[in-house]
């Protein structure tokens, strides 16, 4: 990438390694479900993680050390992040469509009732309600970090980011415990399938968002962000707020109404 108002990138191997990694990971994971292909899956995972690390390292170099991220470049990245979150909204919309398609007009195969016969749904006022409070609190702390960063208060920004990462990890642990104690599985009719797919993909997004925030915390500690140049943090915060909103819809529709 050269220094000019527009986003002109240099030659990079990472799109190629990333696409190869995605292919190997998909093929390997599909094969792993049939008891083979574990090595292919590990190779794909390694390539994806390596590409993520190296590509983000290059972007950080361009923005923090070389000063290539002008206002026009930053605007383009903001538009890209907005489009990415829009695609994620469509992704989760498909799961909610599947859920309501099955729940609003239950098939006779599941007893013409929702939840299906012999399915004991989780109590929405136990772990799910605690997880809701945790994610809402994490949304407050990440906003606190953002305002502290814009105000030049490095200590408060760091402390609030630590709290956000801890809350994200705590949510993941509680979700894993909920899965282990659930009285039904993903194989228990369309209810189990839609429940675990929707909440499982949300849990994956929480893990991804926690990794984003952890990287931002590390960059805060080495003073990569300034009061007016911190889009990496803003993108992670947008993603985290998106995860919060999806969870509120999941809790309302699947845990509370669906039970």
From Swiss-Prot:
It catalyses: 4 Fe(II)-[cytochrome c] + O2 + 8 H(+)(in) = 4 Fe(III)-[cytochrome c] + 2 H2O + 4 H(+)(out). It is a multi-pass membrane protein. Its EC number is 7.1.1.9. The chain crosses the membrane at residues 13-33, 36-56, 80-100, 125-145, 154-174, 195-215, 237-257. It is found in: Mitochondrion inner membrane. InterPro entries: Cyt_c/ubiquinol_Oxase_su3 (IPR024791), Cyt_c_oxase_su3_dom (IPR033945), Cyt_c_oxidase-like_su3 (IPR000298), Cyt_c_oxidase_su3-like_sf (IPR035973), Cyt_c_oxidase_su3_a-hlx (IPR013833). SUPFAM superfamilies: Cytochrome c oxidase subunit III-like. Keywords: Membrane, Mitochondrion, Mitochondrion inner membrane, Translocase, Transmembrane, Transmembrane helix. Its main location: mitochondrion. GO terms for molecular function: cytochrome-c oxidase activity. GO terms for cellular component: mitochondrial inner membrane. It is an enzyme of class 7 (translocase). GO terms for biological process: mitochondrial electron transport, cytochrome c to oxygen. CDD domains: Cyt_c_Oxidase_III (cd01665). Pfam families: COX3 (PF00510). Belongs to the cytochrome c oxidase subunit 3 family. Component of the cytochrome c oxidase (complex IV, CIV), a multisubunit enzyme composed of a catalytic core of 3 subunits and several supernumerary subunits. The complex exists as a monomer or a dimer and forms supercomplexes (SCs) in the inner mitochondrial membrane with ubiquinol-cytochrome c oxidoreductase (cytochrome b-c1 complex, complex III, CIII). Component of the cytochrome c oxidase, the last enzyme in the mitochondrial electron transport chain which drives oxidative phosphorylation. The respiratory chain contains 3 multisubunit complexes succinate dehydrogenase (complex II, CII), ubiquinol-cytochrome c oxidoreductase (cytochrome b-c1 complex, complex III, CIII) and cytochrome c oxidase (complex IV, CIV), that cooperate to transfer electrons derived from NADH and succinate to molecular oxygen, creating an electrochemical gradient over the inner membrane that drives transmembrane transport and the ATP synthase. This is Cytochrome c oxidase subunit 3.
